[in-house]
Amino acid sequence: MKPELIIFDWDGTLADTTRPIIRTFQQSFADCGLKAPDADAIRALIGYSLPEIIFRLAPNAGEHLREELAETYAAHYLNPNNHNMTLFPEAIPCLNTLKQQGFWLAVATGKGRTGLDRSITVSYTHL
């Protein structure tokens, strides 16, 4: 049986989002008066939920501070002026080929729908 639907992950599969995610976490921590986490520590957690990443990066932070970090991260991430992620070079040709072959295409992500929509709307409305 031939599959009809192909589901792709967004972060790290279609889009190269590592640098923007790291930069956004580091800025958020600084904005909340905390030492910015090391890039490698953040990179190792990409793919986990936002609350889980914050808990792992700031295990001693209280609930209020973790909520503030999450709100600050979301505000930075959703700011259209901070958009600078790119799709991997092979992503669009691959998606176009699969679409032409009649496959339904979808994106799954651990980020909220608002974040995904923003990423797509800013630069990739042709997808």
Q: Locations of the language-model features?
A:
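Conserved small/polar residues in nucleotide/adenosyl-binding loops
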Residues: 125-126
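Short, acidic loop-to-helix structural element flanking the phosphoryl-transfer center
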Residues: 79-107, 113-118
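Alpha-helix N-cap/helix-start and coil->helix boundary motif
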Residues: 22, 47, 51, 92, ...
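Helix-loop "lid/cap" segments that line or gate small-molecule binding pockets
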Residues: 28-29, 49-63, 119
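Active-site neighborhood of HAD-like aspartate-dependent phosphohydrolases
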Residues: 2-44
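Metal-dependent phosphoesterase signature
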Residues: 55-93
